[in-house]
Regions:
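An N-cap/entry alpha-helix motif that binds or orients negatively charged groups
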Residues: 1-68, 176-233, 369-371, 377
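Glycine-rich active-site/cofactor-binding loop and its immediate structural neighborhood
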Residues: 71-109, 114
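Alpha/beta enzyme core
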Residues: 81, 95, 120, 136-306, ...
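A gly/proline- and charged-residue-enriched helix-loop-helix capping module
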Residues: 99-120, 124-138
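Short beta->alpha linker loops
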Residues: 30-31, 108-112, 133, 255, ...
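Alpha/beta catalytic cores of nucleotide-metabolism and tRNA/nucleoside-modifying enzymes
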Residues: 1-44, 286-306, 311-379
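Short, conserved beta-strand segments within well-ordered enzyme catalytic domains
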Residues: 47, 62-64, 73-77, 103-107, ...
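Short, basic, glycine/proline-bearing loop/turn elements
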Residues: 75-81, 124-130, 222-224
Length: 379
């Protein structure tokens, strides 16, 4: 990783190192992947307004998110199956985030369980929750999160059923992975990954193991998710979670001002403007396109995060200028993990921070609180 300069360099290394079915799980999106592509294109279309002859010698990207101070306005987005990208992937990604100074969010469908991650943590981490059919299990999962010291719950709302991700179907992705000829050949072509994973051999969802019996029998991921996610999920369920959870509550998956208003009504401390990275509804707008309208509707009544297509510190600047308090990044940091483990995640975070701080300087900005629409050229 010595001769790397940006997230795309780490992505290319990860693509070569990680078996295709696992890389595609992270990198892929729903159907034609048009929304994933649009997320990136829409960000690139936003141009900065450069300013000169302004003292920028004391600039800082430090910020407060959900009542805590962090080095930059960034959080690790929840990503499932991180532990198959690198052994103990969730743990070492969390450690990289802790050392750098940003919050880490554990996914419900992680390889590492809440309890195992908590044993390795030195700072409180966030936990992302899916509402599945078994409400008693959902309740117990929130109680487990509280018991290990989680202070911020991220409730995902845009997955009442699973979007079709064609790459996962083509690759036959399952948990644990099925030993098909294609997959075995692909794994043999990745000796570095195979060597690292040889003694790990954990490919099940740590938070769900023992709860879903088909999980251990290698049921396909698409079949499993369609069986477990609950299409009856509604705002009364969200209110139920709000009543259960005494800590901070972030609602993820908001794409309209109307849903943002309802999120505030049920007691959300923050929302995430998100299209699930294009992994759910292909054809949905880019998150950066809908962010301004949602920000105007919220008018400061809760914090706004955004995700979807963000791969650089410049993208973070764009989001802040259009009304976000912070950005969640998933794929970008997992590319770092796949390229070089904990050191790769740290490298990715370093790229993002440097890009953000440099862009701030060239736009004449000394603190993230100064960033606004005036720093962008009107389209």
């Amino acid at each position: 990783m010595k001769r790397t300069a940006c997230i795309m360099d780490l992505k290319n290394i990860a693509r070569r190192r990680v078996p295709k079915m696992f890389f595609d799980y992270v990198d892929g999106a729903a159907w034609t992947e048009s929304t994933k592509i649009l997320n990136v294109q829409a960000l690139n279309d936003i141009k900065f307004k450069q300013r000169v002859a302004i003292d920028i010698s004391n600039r800082s990207a430090k910020t407060n998110l959900i009542g805590s101070s962090f080095r930059i306005p960034l959080a690790m987005a929840p990503i499932g199956l991180t532990g198959v990208i690198w052994p103990n992937g969730e743990i070492i990604t969390m450690k990289a985030c802790e050392e750098f100074g940003i919050p880490y969010c554990l996914s419900t469908v992680s390889i590492t369980s809440l309890e195992s991650l908590a044993k390795a943590a030195s700072e409180p981490f966030w936990f992302q929750l899916y509402v599945i059919r078994d409400r008693d299990f959902v309740k117990r999962l929130t109680q487990r999160a509280e018991a290990v010291g989680v202070e911020t719950l991220v409730l995902t709302l845009d997955l009442p059923l699973s979007g079709q991700r064609n790459r996962d179907i083509y690759n036959g992705l399952s948990s644990p992975p099925k030993p098909t000829i294609f997959n075995l050949i692909d794994i043999l072509r990745r000796p570095a990954w195979s060597y690292e994973m040889l003694h790990f051999r954990n490919f099940n969802f740590g938070n769900l193991k023992g709860h879903v019996t088909n999980l251990e029998r290698g049921k396909s991921l698409a079949e499993w998710t369609n069986d477990q996610y609950d299409p009856s999920l509604n705002w009364q369920d969200v209110k139920w979670i709000r009543d259960l959870w005494k800590g901070k509550l972030i609602l993820k998956g908001i794409l309209s001002p109307e849903d943002a208003e309802t999120a505030i009504e049920v007691g959300a401390d923050a929302i995430v403007v998100s299209n699930h990275g294009g992994r759910q509804l292909d054809g949905a707008p880019a998150t950066i396109q809908v962010l301004p309208d949602i920000s105007n509707a919220i008018a400061g009544r809760c914090e706004i995060f955004v995700d979807g297509g963000f791969t650089s510190g410049q993208d973070v600047f764009r989001a802040l200028a259009l009304g976000a308090k912070g950005v969640l990044m998933g794929r970008a940091l997992i590319y770092g993990l796949g390229a070089g483990g904990q050191a790769g995640v740290q490298k990715a975070l370093g790229f993002i921070a440097h890009e953000l701080e440099t862009t701030m300087g060239l736009c004449g900005v000394n603190s993230v609180s100064e960033i606004g629409p005036h720093n962008l050229h009107a389209n």
